[in-house]
Amino acid sequence: MDTHTLKSVSDLPGNFRSAFSFRYFNSLQSECFPLCFHSDINMIISAPTGSGKTVLFELCILRLFSKSISKEGSFLHAKGALKTVYISPSKALVQEKLRDWNQKFNSWGISCLELTGDNETYSTKNIQDADIILTTPEKFDAVSRYRVTSGGLGFFSDIALVLIDEVHLLNDPRGAALEAIVSRLKILSSNHELRSSTLASVRLLAVSATIPNIEDLAEWLKVPTAGIKRFGEEMRPVKLTTKVFGYAAAKNDFLFEKRLQNYIYDILMQYSKGKSALVFCSTRKGAQEAAQKLAQTAMTYGYSNPFIKSREQLERLREASPMCSDKQMQSYILQGVGYHNGGLCQKDRSLVEGLFLNGDIQVICTTNTLAHGINLPAHTVVIKSTQHFNKEKGHYMEYDRSTLLQMSGRAGRPPFDDTGMVIIMTRRETVHLYENLLNGCEVVESQLLPCLIEHLTAEIVQLTISDITRAIEWMKCSYLYVRMKKNPENYAIKKGIPKDRVEKHLQELCLQKINELSQYQMIWTDTDGFVLKPEEPGRLMTKYYLKFETMKYIINTPTSYSLDEALHIVCHAEEISWIQLRRNEKKTLNDVNADKEGRLRFHINDNKGKRKKRIQTREEKLFVLANDWLTGDPSVHDLSMTQDANSICSNGSRIARCMKEYFIYKKNYKGTLSSTLLAKSLYQKLWDDSPYLLKQLPGIGMVTAKALHSMGVRSFEALAEADPRRIEIVTGRKYPFGNTIKESLSSLPPKVEIKVEEVDCQKQGISKLAVTLSRVSQPLQSTKRHYADLIVGSEEENLIHFHEKIRMEDFSSPYSVTVLLERPHQQTKVTVKADLIFEEYIGIDLHETLLLKKANNNKVNYKSENRMPQYYPPMASACIADDDNPVTSGPSNRKDKKDDMPSFKLIDDDSEEEKEPYVTMEEDDCVIINEHTVFDHIREKAKCFPSLNPLNPTSSPASGKSILKRKSLVENNSPELDPLFQYDSVFDLPTNTKDIKQSAQQITSPGYASFAEKTETERPFSDETIFNYIRKRSKNSPALATSKIENPITISSQEGRNAEISPYRTYGLLVSPATKIPRITSDAPSEILSFDISMVKRSDTSLEQTKGFCSTLAGKSNVSDSFLGFKSIFSFL
């Protein structure tokens, strides 16, 4: 384009001219100017690196802002109403654009927000208010996944412009995320419910390097023909020459890159022509070592150093060298060489950059971040190895195309050079890949198919897809559909298939994936398989970015599993399946698993339970490696295995967190605890029983942790009490290191206490538990949030009864929750545990245990607590039988009973056999027995049954119940006791030990027992009468303590009632219908405890003495039960 046709910045409205520092746009920008600024059509631009494509983004942003300019020419900004989303393949590019656009647009009130892994401080409100969102594909996809349940996707409807930088990323495995989010935006924009929103008319603009199939991308993005712009190498300001050199592979990627250092000097001497050069290395250490190698080589030439051209240059280097704080860098600068990475301080980085721009330093060895950030062009660019170490994946990976193009774009300095040189050093087998890459001959294909099921699940979870029709429509919005029609063989479609059948194949593929998801209960479908709804496993797989195979493995896990089994699940995960067992690693792993020092928590065992002598599989390697790493002091120092271990910990922690939430959903108590502990351990790279727990604190590494361990400081509590000066002496550090270490304790969550107790036992055997959290220390003023999971579960049932996630700084102390728990019926006991498990830190979790005994007919509640035991002495022979309803195990409801008889609560045999569980009694029910309380209580009971006359079972048929009252033996007939003594003669019971034994032996056939008719007028009993009767029954029944009947004996009556004598040590009698044979279960006493009325009538006994006296009697009654003695009095209380 001629210069007279170049567009001027003055063609923009006056409000926007300050956005550009130049007067004219270049030829590429001028040609795209009308479409970018004066229209809203979608566009795709293919142009070489460095041709000025970024300005096109800014023109489209200004076009969007121009809609907010009033007729008067003022800029009226509505915060967040019209959003721009900028998507870049790298965080470095995002941060570069963020700095640039903040500087340009901030004065207009435009807010920019970075959404990358480096920025986790944003909130939903920040996203809602942002005008420009700068993000990477993976992060934008993850943000939309995480916030779907909290309504965090509301900003989608405000998206008006989407800018896609380096769209050729689609050809990279990472391109699946980019394809998924663009397809999501496309299908949402076609949603009828959003037809009135900004998203319905969203504009898409994509730029890329030179690619051969730009038309396919245009079809996917719905770009009209006018919006397709293709520019060749003529648009590049400096012509580039590319050379690709292949080298033989080494044993591992690390050694291969290190070996390439030997070739760099010769390459620079041959191709740089004495001009400036950038050497891109994959790691900081690699950049430093490359600079060291070049400086040492140049030093051998003395005054003939090829990197120093003049004496003046040498003098400037000598002056600058002492200004560098890095001692090693000082020696490199003197040779005309430097290195640049994130490990340098800002002062040293600025010094190196200035020396390079001035031409004093000829060579800089740097990491790939310099390719995206500071503009330091050079004549020659050397890319030392095409692989870099990916921290997220934990292993070496090939550079993506955009990164390589960015590095190559640094070659050539427009003001000084008219040519540039790019040297790529790679392995021999990958030479052809990079030749096609730089020449623009590589066709961009879709990478969505290998992870289609995961992205399909994500759309169902986000409700983008609600039925089969919508699912097929979403797939048609993908780049996969476009390339399937153009190149079906590349996507597992038979060669030669008609193009019209591609759509049918796509539908079959969609149905296949949905059936798989439904089979594993990740989604729900109706009977017709049409409606699609997400299930919790599918939500979790989407939330934690897990592979489908990994989630299947978690779902198929046995119900009950331990911590080591949880670690085995992680080792089988698809996310770390790329880690392989190398031959040279087997000996080291075998030695680690042998564990002669007893360092490891778990080992690989054979079928006999012994430690395996040989590690044979990839999963076994991962398991051993993880155990060695989690000791806190690993014995494996091999770089390759160290990288593998880091990958296990980073990916494993995410997988374990997903397992935790899945088992909470399944209410699996043991699985939840194991997964939670494993997730924290992998995150901290420590087991919870490690002696180096202090490594969790900032500023404490392994050396400091070992030093503290040697002085006995092994816990957070011990560190809080330690002397700062002694810490400095032991660690060999200077003041105020000790104070700093102690201050790091402020990063821990506030200290709390947990308590669990049983507060009530309701009907149907339901226990009410109270779990209380109390904050012991006040939370410190900190921006860090601490969360913990409160879990209440039972071990025997492996069941979670309650779960809540709590923010430790915010809950109101004390915080109490009520948990209803069904008492055990089949098991003899249930161990209830309340656990407060912190999300991040290990070694500070809280656990509390409560023991619940099996529910019995009398519904006595047991609990373990720090309360003195209180016992209800058992009744001797009082029972109530119900003709209509069977006796249930639930507690009796006093309101449903008539007041004509007292309620007698019997204690089960198990209640006095256990030492730890106690019978619960509310404090208000505890009564001190004295003269007044005993007689008052008897009078109250006497009101309910004014006469203890015999009941005629035939006289009240309407009631449907017959009640058997207690019968005893009598020796002498006192006139005032006749109404009581007549009960003894009803069944003709014996009155002494000898007669009792004979009666027991002679009853061999059913007999009859009937109640006598009432023959005299009812009259109430006096207090003295009752106690005399009790006293005589106590003295006249010693034989009952030793009698024992081996088998129960049934006594039949003419009224159709049966009485059964229990074989237990206590005699009792029960009357019920013939179809119900009751059993008397009271225990017979082994020792008679007599009671005299004078004990109660002592008026001079003090309150304290009375308390002690009653406690003594209650204690004796635990081991010695009387038949009709003191315990009968207690049964009324």
Curated annotation (Swiss-Prot):
It comes from the Eukaryota. PROSITE patterns: HELICASE_ATP_BIND_1, HELICASE_CTER. GO terms for biological process: chiasma assembly; reciprocal meiotic recombination. Residues 909-919 have a biased composition (Acidic residues). Disruption phenotype: Low levels of fertility due to a significant decrease of meiotic crossovers. GO terms for cellular component: nucleus. Gene3D superfamilies: 5' to 3' exonuclease, C-terminal subdomain, P-loop containing nucleotide triphosphate hydrolases, Sec63 N-terminal domain-like domain, Winged helix-like DNA-binding domain superfamily/Winged helix DNA-binding domain. Residues 263-460 form the Helicase C-terminal domain. This is ATP-dependent DNA helicase homolog MER3. Residues 536-847 form the SEC63 domain. SMART domains: DEXDc, HELICc, Sec63. A motif (DEVH box) lies at residues 165-168. PANTHER family: HELICASE FOR MEIOSIS 1, HFM1, ATP DEPENDENT DNA HELICASE HOMOLOG. Belongs to the helicase family. SKI2 subfamily. Expressed in meiocytes during meiosis. It comes from Arabidopsis thaliana (Mouse-ear cress). DNA helicase required for crossover formation, complete synapsis of homologous chromosomes and bivalent formation during meiosis. Is specific to recombination events resulting in interference-sensitive crossovers (class I meiotic crossover). It is found in: Nucleus. The lineage of its organism: Eukaryota, Viridiplantae, Streptophyta, Embryophyta, Tracheophyta. GO terms for molecular function: ATP binding; ATP hydrolysis activity; DNA binding; DNA helicase activity; RNA helicase activity; rRNA binding. Residues 34-229 form the Helicase ATP-binding domain.
